[in-house]
Curated annotation (Swiss-Prot):
Disordered: region residues: 1-33
Pfam families, A to Z: Ribosomal_S25
Keyword vocabulary terms for this entry: Ribonucleoprotein, Ribosomal protein
Organism encoding this protein: Amaranthus cruentus
Protein name: Small ribosomal subunit protein eS25
Protein family according to the UniProt entry: Belongs to the eukaryotic ribosomal protein eS25 family.
UniProt key word Ribonucleoprotein: yes
Amino acid sequence: MAPKKDKAPPPSSKPAKSGGKQKKKKWSKGKQKEKVNNLVLFDNATFDKLLSEAGKQKVVTAATLSERFRINGSLARRAIRELVSRGAIKMVCHHSSLQIYTRSTNEKVNPTAA
């Protein structure tokens, strides 16, 4: 009697697995930033609020005004120009992309006390 041939598994196109069986990794859903709905034009209430409160802030930048008053970035830059012209804030440091301002104090500079 001829010896029985063991059935060999049919050849597959997949390479042989090594190691234990692992779950397939799932893609995580990317986090999406919430869209902000900022004002593009000033209304009277927002402009009056800006004039009264922005001069009291320690640090004034376009980003802080945009976040606090919910206004557009370009509108915040125009508001800063208006506040500087009124003397409510003064420039501390400027860079090509960021200008930093602070509240104006009504101190008189003594030229002889240097």
